[in-house]
């Protein structure tokens, strides 16, 4: 796979010098050669004489010729709706900066016959570029197939979990390639040994495998942010470095979660066409704003390059981060919590037994680790595009709720449980909840959000009676006990 510079040089070398007028009026020239009638021939000559080849016409001819020659050589050029240019290098599409493309098109113009000073004129260079934005326009819409791109093959993951191998195609619109070859017989015994040491719970390993598998295809809807939690010397850093190389360093970014969620959007544009944004050391508070939820859900999000207009980005990295403890947030809603995929790295590695070169040794097993990730992707699809259940992770989620959600804290403190036979007015329960929050310096939810959260915790809330008041199906899990020291009255 050649570099962009090498490919552009090759395309340039195959462009012929042309007479722009002959190319533009090709049909008239052909007719003139075959015409026998002198009067008609004279009319054709007069017509050709009056044709003026403007800069606009030359711009069209340059853009169309570049597209034609690139295609014949097995390459491709396209510009999308955001005016971002890409070059197909026979394996994947790589971005070309606007300035590099302008210089290339200027060289093409000169190669095709323009004099040096005309070709280098800024006005004309800009005109050719604007024409290229039209002639090379391609929205590059991906199909719905689940595919993975490597150096030597493209893999198609079928609905039944089987894997098919295909040759590379520009029409797949891959903007990445894993930096190694596919080997269906590869193994990774050292990686499995590492996983069993740092994540002995098999249910957790399975979910982690499925998440990494989903990172291999950005079009999969997952709506999860990986949160690897644990204090030092527990394998998080080795896992981070290994995933960095499995997915390819060029395909992974490491921007701080909160910088991705700010209003400016400069960091967000940098995760466009990446497979994963893995922040290796995040310890703090996640901004509770809508941008985090958008990013976690893979929804279109506004981003911008410095000094440029904002654009809507659709294909961007999944999010992951390592942290010593579960992060806090001003948003304690279910919608926020459900997007966090908490993986507990709670096994301490004995410093005397730790291998400082383990991450380097695991590089030799990348094709095998890829097969591990593909197995996770296949299981995710067989699950109906859902992560496998994990009692360990569910327990972590419940603990997180009890530590961050005032409604869940209240229910736990009062030993309340859902019970369709027990009834309590929502108004009374909410008043009791507010008193609990005041006593514990917590910000209470309003009555509507309180009701919604109760329903989220599987409490039945319905309007009953003649006044249609909301009633909650709730009871106390610890029955009251009469003290043996008090005589009944």
Predicted regions and their residues:
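Feature primarily recognizes SF3-like P-loop helicase cores of small DNA viruses
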Residues: 1-82, 110-489
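Trp- and S/T/G-rich repeat-edge/linker motifs of beta-rich repeat architectures
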Residues: 83-88, 92-106
């Amino acid at each position: 796979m050649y570099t962009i510079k090498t490919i552009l040089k090759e395309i340039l070398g195959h462009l012929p010098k042309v007479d722009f007028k002959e190319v533009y009026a090709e049909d008239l020239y052909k007719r003139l050669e075959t015409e026998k009638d002198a009067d008609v021939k004279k009319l054709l000559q007069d017509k050709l004489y009056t044709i003026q080849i403007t800069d606009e016409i030359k711009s069209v001819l340059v853009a169309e010729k570049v597209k034609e020659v690139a295609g014949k050589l097995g390459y491709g050029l396209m510009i999308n709706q955001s005016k971002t240019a890409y070059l197909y290098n026979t394996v994947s599409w790589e971005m070309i900066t606007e300035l590099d493309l302008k210089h290339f098109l200027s060289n093409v113009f000169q190669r095709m016959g323009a004099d040096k000073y005309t070709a280098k004129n800024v006005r004309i260079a800009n005109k050719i570029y604007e024409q290229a934005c039209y002639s090379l326009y391609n929205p590059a819409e991906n199909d719905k197939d689940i595919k993975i791109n490597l150096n030597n093959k493209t893999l198609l993951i079928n609905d039944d979990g089987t894997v098919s191998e295909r040759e590379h195609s520009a029409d797949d619109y891959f903007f990445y390639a894993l930096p190694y070859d596919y080997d269906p017989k590869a193994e990774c015994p050292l990686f499995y040994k590492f996983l069993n040491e740092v994540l002995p719970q098999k249910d957790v390993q399975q979910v982690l495998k499925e998440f990494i598998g989903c990172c291999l295809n950005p079009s999969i809807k997952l709506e999860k942010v990986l949160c690897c939690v644990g204090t030092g010397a527990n394998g998080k850093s080795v896992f981070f470095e290994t995933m960095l190389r499995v997915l390819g360093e060029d395909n992974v970014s490491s921007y701080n979660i909160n910088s991705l969620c700010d209003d400016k959007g400069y960091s967000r544009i940098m995760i466009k066409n990446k497979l994963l944004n893995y922040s290796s050391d995040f310890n703090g508070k996640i901004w509770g704003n809508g941008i985090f939820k958008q990013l976690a859900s893979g929804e279109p999000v506004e981003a911008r390059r410095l000094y440029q207009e904002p654009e809507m980005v659709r294909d961007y990295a999944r999010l992951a981060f390592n942290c010593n403890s579960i992060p806090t947030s001003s948003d304690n809603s279910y919608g926020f919590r459900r997007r966090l995929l908490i993986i507990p790295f709670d096994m301490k590695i004995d410093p005397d037994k730790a291998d400082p070169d383990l991450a380097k040794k695991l590089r030799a097993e990348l094709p095998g680790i890829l097969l591990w990730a593909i197995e996770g992707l296949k299981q995710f699809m067989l699950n109906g595009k859902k992560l496998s259940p994990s009692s360990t992770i569910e327990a972590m989620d419940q603990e997180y709720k009890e530590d961050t959600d005032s409604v869940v804290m209240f229910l736990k403190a009062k030993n309340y449980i859902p019970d369709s036979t027990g009834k309590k007015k929502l108004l009374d329960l909410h008043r009791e909840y507010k008193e609990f929050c005041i006593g514990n310096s917590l910000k209470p939810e309003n009555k509507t959000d309180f009701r919604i959260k109760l329903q989220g915790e599987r409490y039945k809330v319905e309007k009953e009676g003649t006044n249609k008041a909301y009633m909650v199906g709730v009871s106390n899990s610890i029955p009251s006990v009469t003290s043996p020291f008090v005589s009944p009255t």
